[in-house]
């Protein structure tokens, strides 16, 4: 940490999040919370490590819970098409399989016929084997974000029925044993509590672009203590998370001022999302701005610079970066209740998904979609649609 703020002697103490944070957890990664104390100021750092199903191609009986006793009026095949990998590695390990077993559901789950999915950095980092220690066994069908139609419900499911159009992040814990069955398939099984009814005004492709990114954006703002009347600087405002941070800060939390950075060609997008100040990082250094901000939300990994523009006592949310002891780590979780909470803002159009103009990518172009995502140049989300 001395390298991060070389002019300041730092003392780190772990923060214990208030109980009010427990209800709306982000599935994006684990979060570490550090309080940094200097001689003149204190900032709070929330650092995230970006981290991403059965192929029973076959899963042993011990690895799957007994299927729920359910019935369905919808015809469901025994096998499906799905993208999978049996070894960790580059995009070359991804294979499109046509005889993957459709997953069974547990009593608290629904089976979703997937219409659209979206990719996140966690997906390719998981594929690269960054999280082997806590990953589910190979083979893996990747994918977190999903939008589709419920075709079967478990015996304990109360709030959803066959035919409901839903969306969500299917992995309750992003890093701790995520499912083998992800969303890059024709079907997936997911707990009822992790999904919500799709906003009526959104297409399946638009809905699939939201879950992981909007939960990450909302969670970061909440944990940073952001509230009405505060100012925020968003680094990487045109990305999947950054584009939603701008909108949530402005239209949900009531920010007094929203500034954001992007390349030259994306400045108008920032303004359309609600940014009061759009900064071209190819021509300007945001750390030279005359004003400081209550919160800096760093989605691109510029923590050293971010701390230079935060107010005394302000907060910095960082989506990339190592945890420095004695900071502690805890795993955040997906929660459909948060999606329900944001539904009015989505259906009113105050908060909108941003889909990269190169997409949506068709289901047979998943390798191209991964390759594009890994360039780091995507605007908004990389979406896969339709999924046959």
Curated annotation (Swiss-Prot):
SMART domains, alphabetically?
Answer: PKS_ER (SM00829)
Write down any Gene Ontology CC term: chloroplast
Query: Reaction catalysed?
Result: 4-hydroxy-2,5-dimethyl-furan-3(2H)-one + NADP(+) = 4-hydroxy-5-methyl-2-methylenefuran-3(2H)-one + NADPH + H(+)
Q: Where does substrate bind?
A: 125
Transit peptide location: 1-60
Quick one: which residues bind NADP(+)?
Answer: 125, 240-241, 263-266, 281, 330-332, 377-378
Q: How does it assemble?
A: Monomer.
Can you say what this protein is called?
Answer: 2-methylene-furan-3-one reductase
Q: Which gene encodes it?
A: EO
């Amino acid at each position: 940490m001395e390298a991060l703020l070389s002019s300041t002697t730092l003392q780190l103490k772990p923060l214990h999040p208030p109980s009010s944070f427990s209800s709306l957890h982000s599935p994006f990664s684990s979060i570490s919370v550090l309080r940094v104390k200097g001689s003149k100021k204190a900032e709070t750092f929330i650092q995230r490590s970006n981290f991403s199903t059965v192929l029973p191609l076959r899963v042993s009986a011990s690895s799957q819970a007994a299927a729920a006793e359910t019935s369905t009026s919808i015809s469901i095949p025994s096998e499906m098409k799905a993208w999978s990998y049996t070894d960790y590695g580059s995009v070359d390990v991804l294979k499109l399989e046509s005889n993957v077993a459709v997953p069974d559901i547990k009593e608290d789950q629904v089976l979703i016929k997937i219409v659209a999915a979206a990719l996140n950095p966690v997906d390719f980092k998981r594929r690269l084997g960054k999280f082997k220690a806590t990953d589910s066994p190979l083979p893996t069908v990747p994918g977190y974000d999903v939008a589709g139609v419920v075709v079967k419900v478990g015996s304990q499911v109360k709030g959803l029925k066959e035919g409901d159009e839903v969306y969500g992040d299917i992995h309750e814990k992003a890093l701790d044993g995520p499912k083998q069955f992800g969303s890059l398939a024709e079907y997936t099984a997911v707990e009822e509590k992790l999904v919500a009814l799709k906003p009526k005004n959104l297409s399946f492709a638009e809905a699939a672009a939201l879950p992981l990114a909007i939960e990450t954006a909302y969670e970061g703002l909440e944990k940073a203590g952001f509230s009405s009347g505060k100012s925020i600087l968003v680094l990487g405002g045109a990305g999947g998370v950054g584009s939603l941070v701008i909108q949530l800060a402005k239209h949900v939390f009531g920010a007094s001022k929203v500034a954001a950075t992007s390349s030259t060609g994306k400045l108008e997008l920032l303004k359309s999302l609600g940014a009061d100040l759009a900064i071209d990082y190819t021509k300007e250094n945001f750390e030279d701005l005359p004003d400081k901000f209550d919160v800096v939300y760093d989605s691109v990994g510029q923590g050293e610079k971010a701390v230079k523009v935060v107010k005394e006592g302000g907060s910095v949310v960082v989506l990339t970066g190592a945890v420095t002891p004695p900071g502690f780590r805890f795993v955040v979780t997906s929660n459909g209740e948060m999606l329900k909470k944001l539904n009015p803002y989505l259906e009113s159009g105050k908060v909108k998904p941003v889909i990269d103009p190169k997409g949506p990518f068709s289901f047979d172009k998943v390798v191209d979609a991964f390759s594009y995502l890994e360039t780091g140049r995507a605007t908004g989300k990389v979406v896969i649609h339709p999924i046959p």
